[in-house]
């Protein structure tokens, strides 16, 4: 009986990890679409995963920011960066998705 409980626990954890990796991959793909498209982030920022070589904003491969900090800047703008949330360019879900992407350095 203990073996069955162990196997069941293992399978639950294994399946959960697979589901999370698919969710992460889907979120990353959606983030890339926003980064290179609607958000126009690639025009100003460097991000290897997006194939972007912008030279106006910071290189996102080199900044060390929290998710909340990135989300705040994308929403409200900073310096020459426009407020993509306040001007209606991106909705809340799109801001969270592109903010997540900007933290992934692959």
Report residues per predicted region:
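Gly/Gly-Pro-rich "capping" loops immediately C-terminal to redox-active cysteine motifs
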Residues: 42-75, 80, 86
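Conserved small/polar residues in nucleotide/adenosyl-binding loops
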Residues: 104-106
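Bacterial N-terminal signal peptides
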Residues: 9-17
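The canonical Cys-X-X-Cys-His
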Residues: 31, 38-47, 98
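Bacterial N-terminal signal peptides that target proteins for export
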Residues: 1-8
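Electrostatic cytochrome c docking/interface patches
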Residues: 17-36, 69
């Amino acid at each position: 009986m203990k073996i069955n409980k162990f196997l069941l626990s293992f399978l639950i954890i294994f399946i959960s990890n697979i589901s999370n990796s698919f969710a992460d991959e889907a979120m990353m793909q959606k983030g890339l679409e926003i980064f290179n498209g609607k958000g126009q982030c690639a025009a100003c920022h460097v991000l290897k995963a997006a194939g972007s070589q912008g030279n106006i904003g910071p290189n996102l491969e080199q900044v060390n920011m929290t998710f909340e900090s990135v989300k705040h800047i994308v929403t409200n703008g900073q310096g020459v960066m426009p407020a993509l949330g306040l001007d209606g360019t991106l909705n809340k879900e799109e801001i969270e998705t592109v903010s997540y992407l900007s933290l992934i350095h692959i």
